[in-house]
């Protein structure tokens, strides 16, 4: 009977350690986000024909360590050539910026009146993220010139 107990303890310890190891190996934390897009002096669209306005971006579920990309099209809707700048605001929770970064591939080129460029927006989630299960923030695209 004593041998059976020792065997059960060893089996229980083995199973428990496998659960811990599996938990360490599998990042099953998914983050959900929706970001609002505000445009100043420009239009931001889902298509190059500028018929589908972007008002928000649903990043969907993202695992730790993931990079999510979306392509948008930005049109100069002002009356002079412009360059673009980007800001993010209203991060919720406020510490999300410790683990989540946002960037784009715009290279600073001048955009003439009514011209359209494609831009990739990227969301990067740190593999060390903790304590955040949902987040949101606003993206502000500014055309100036």
Where are these regions (language model features)?
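Surface-exposed binding patches on compact interaction domains or structured appendages
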Residues: 38-54, 79-116
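Short, polar/proline-rich extracytoplasmic segments that appear immediately after membrane translocation
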Residues: 2-57, 61-62, 142-145
């Amino acid at each position: 009977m004593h041998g059976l107990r020792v065997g059960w303890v060893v089996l229980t310890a083995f199973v428990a350690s496998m659960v811990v190891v599996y938990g360490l190996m599998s990042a099953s934390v998914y983050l959900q986000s929706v970001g609002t897009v505000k445009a100043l002096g420009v239009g931001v669209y889902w298509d190059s024909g500028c018929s589908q306005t972007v008002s928000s971006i649903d990043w969907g579920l993202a695992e730790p360590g993931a990079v999510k990309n979306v392509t948008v099209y930005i049109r100069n809707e002002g009356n002079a050539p412009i360059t673009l700048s980007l800001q993010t605001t209203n991060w919720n929770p406020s510490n999300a910026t410790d683990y989540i970064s946002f960037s784009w591939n715009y290279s600073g080129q001048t955009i003439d009146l009514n011209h359209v460029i494609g831009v990739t927006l990227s969301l990067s989630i740190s593999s060390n993220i903790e304590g955040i299960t949902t987040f949101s923030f606003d993206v502000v695209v500014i055309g100036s010139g």
